[in-house]
């Protein structure tokens, strides 16, 4: 295949909220440009993971190169990079945008603009991309394009009166959209003769090929067989295979400035080609690496432990392979008295945490226990030291703590006026402080400062149910703020269970302690002795319940006769139970750890 001239290349991605029809539109592009034969077409071609198809969401960014014949008679090479729409995967979006010159802003003509779309769209505009508004689902009876166009102009602030109206499901106006895309989005710039600079947008591990990297060539030309250098590690490799996806893998001889494609260089070390790094030639190397992406900080932390301790090594390898493919995942070894050895993992949000756990269990056949998720707190000790704690069991003694500061997030919410009351009530319940309230044409834009610990756990789900699915949310960490927080310990038979400890606000501690002990009472199986379940703040017990003992009928064999005989047997049983209570261990089932998560949801 001959190398196409740079002026006929267009690199673009699609910005859209979940369920606004982004993956369906991508399918139509592939069909229209003949990327796959009719037999190979299936719905959501680019959502390659089973989880993506089951949940109907896009998690990983994918890339496709399509050839499109325009009305002007020229063939254009369209490099389309698919992006996820959920707030937890926003870092994937910023990586995709770094490889593009333009973006399609796809908005559902019935639902209107959502908060997450606004945030991503601003990222695209900041990176200097041309944003092209598109109205999708125009075939729906409840579609109201005029209202949505007004909303795009009011909320995002870009011209939208000539937005293209398409129906991706029916394939209506998709060709017209591609025609306009070719005109509106500029071709890439970059000198093909300059020293090579290629930005790694994504990487994944293939058992046969090693690390496969998705790259965008910014300058220079990468040819098959070239000796290339990874700029951050300084290691050299040979480019064994290069090519692009159509969406099938198609080998090429070279990738020149402006192109998007994959490189296989026999890198067997999982961290050999980190995402956001720059590839260059080993001999004529570029002077400086390209600016990468901003490093994402994990917001939610949880302990992940294998149920079988023999699975620790496979679990560690699985995490390393997954981290290559998911740059936002963070992990470090951790041990727990209750659960043994495992890892403390950092995630971007609860959905990210669920997806990671599900991928580990499915793709690597592991059985895992997850502890209650927490956020990272800033602790100022009485000695004036500053500590960051993301694990309740690492919290210093209460006497040594000067001040605990919790992370505060700024949450932007868009909601129809009908549900405003319910959403405000929810924000107040979550200890939110209102900063801004703005009435737009058909929506209300609200800005709240809410503690991050309240946002990440179940705020998104509660917001959706309070607004019947119409509200949308975008949040970001803002600052740390002093708060009256305490560590809530759970004791079972007088023993602290480190995996069940949580950090809560003092006002909520009593309620939370009572709910937790009640829930655990139902989940811990009855033993031959009474089991006390207590919630404590420091040395003060604030709630208690008991799991009553199972009792064998020891007097069943006595028929009539002397009462002292029965009494003797009962006393003997009582003494045995007392001894058992001192030495007996209680096995805590997996459900008990999950109870900590579910207490908040009810």
Curated annotation (Swiss-Prot):
Q: Name one GO molecular function term.
A: translation elongation factor activity
Topology versus the membrane:
Peripheral membrane protein
What role does this protein play?
Answer: Required for accurate and efficient protein synthesis under certain stress conditions. May act as a fidelity factor of the translation reaction, by catalyzing a one-codon backward translocation of tRNAs on improperly translocated ribosomes. Back-translocation proceeds from a post-translocation (POST) complex to a pre-translocation (PRE) complex, thus giving elongation factor G a second chance to translocate the tRNAs correctly. Binds to ribosomes in a GTP-dependent manner.
| A Pfam family matched in the record | EFG_C
So what does this thing catalyse? GTP + H2O = GDP + phosphate + H(+)
Name used for this protein in its record: Elongation factor 4
The Gene Ontology biological process terms listed for this entry are: positive regulation of translation
Q: Which InterPro entries match?
A: EF-4, EFG_III/V, EFG_V-like, EFTu-like_2, G_TR_CS, LepA_C_sf, LepA_CTD, LepA_IV
Listed EC numbers: 3.6.5.n1
Residue span(s) of domain tr-type G = 7-189
């Amino acid at each position: 295949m001959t190398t196409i001239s740079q002026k006929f290349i267009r690199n673009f991605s699609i910005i859209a909220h979940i369920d606004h029809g982004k993956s369906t539109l991508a399918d139509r592009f592939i069909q229209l440009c003949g990327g796959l034969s009719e037999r190979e077409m299936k719905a959501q071609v680019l959502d390659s993971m089973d989880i993506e198809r089951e949940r109907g969401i896009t998690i990983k960014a994918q890339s496709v190169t399509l050839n499109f014949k325009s009305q002007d008679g020229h063939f254009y090479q369209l490099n389309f990079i698919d992006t996820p729409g959920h707030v937890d995967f926003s870092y994937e979006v910023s990586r995709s945008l770094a490889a593009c010159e333009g973006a399609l802003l796809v908005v559902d003509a019935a639902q209107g603009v959502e908060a997450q779309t606004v945030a991503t769209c601003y990222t695209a505009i900041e990176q200097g991309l041309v944003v092209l508004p598109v109205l999708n689902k125009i075939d729906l009876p409840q579609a109201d394009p005029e209202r949505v166009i007004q909303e795009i102009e009011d909320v995002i602030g870009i011209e939208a009166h000539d937005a293209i109206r398409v129906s991706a499901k029916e394939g209506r106006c998709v060709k017209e959209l591609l025609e306009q895309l070719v005109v509106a989005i500029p071709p890439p710039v970059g000198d093909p003769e300059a020293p090579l600079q290629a930005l790694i947008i994504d990487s994944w591990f293939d058992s046969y090929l090693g690390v496969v990297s998705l790259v965008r060539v910014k300058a220079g030309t990468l040819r098959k067989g070239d000796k290339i250098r990874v700029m951050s590690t300084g290691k050299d490799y040979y480019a064994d295979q290069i090519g692009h996806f159509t969406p099938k893998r198609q080998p090429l001889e070279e990738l020149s400035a402006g192109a998007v494609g994959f490189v296989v260089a026999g890198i067997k070390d999982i961290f050999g080609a980190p995402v956001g790094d720059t590839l260059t030639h080993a001999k004529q190397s570029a002077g400086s690496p390209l600016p990468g992406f901003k490093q994402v900080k994990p917001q939610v932390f949880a302990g992940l432990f294998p149920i079988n301790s023999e699975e620790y090594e496979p679990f560690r390898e699985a995490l390393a392979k997954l981290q290559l493919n998911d740059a936002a995942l963070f992990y470090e070894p951790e041990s727990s008295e209750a659960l043994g050895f495992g890892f403390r993992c950092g995630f971007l949000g609860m959905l990210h945490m669920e997806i990671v756990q599900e991928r580990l269990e499915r793709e690597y056949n592991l059985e895992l226990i997850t502890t209650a998720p927490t956020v990272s707190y800033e602790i100022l000790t009485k000695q004036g030291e500053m500590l960051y704690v993301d694990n309740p069991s690492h919290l210093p003694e209460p006497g040594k703590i000067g001040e605990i500061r919790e992370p505060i997030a700024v949450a932007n919410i868009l909601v129809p006026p009908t549900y405003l009351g319910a959403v405000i009530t929810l924000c107040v319940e979550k200890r939110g402080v209102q900063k801004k309230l703005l009435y737009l044409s058909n929506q209300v834009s609200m800005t709240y400062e809410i503690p991050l610990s309240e946002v990440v756990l179940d705020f998104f789900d509660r917001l959706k149910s309070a607004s019947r699915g119409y509200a949308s949310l975008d949040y970001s960490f803002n600052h740390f703020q002093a708060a009256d927080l305490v560590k809530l310990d759970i004791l079972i038979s007088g023993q602290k269970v480190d995996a069940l400890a949580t950090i809560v606000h003092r006002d909520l501690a009593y309620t939370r302690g009572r709910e937790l002990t009640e829930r655990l009472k139902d989940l811990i199986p009855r033993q031959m002795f009474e089991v006390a379940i207590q919630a404590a703040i420091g040395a003060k017990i604030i709630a208690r319940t008991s799991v009553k003992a199972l009792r064998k009928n020891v007097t069943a064999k006595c028929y009539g006769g002397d009462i002292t005989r029965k009494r003797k047997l009962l006393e003997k049983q009582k003494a045995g139970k007392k001894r058992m209570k001192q030495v007996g261990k209680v096995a805590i089932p997996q459900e008990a750890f999950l109870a900590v998560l579910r207490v908040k949801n009810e």
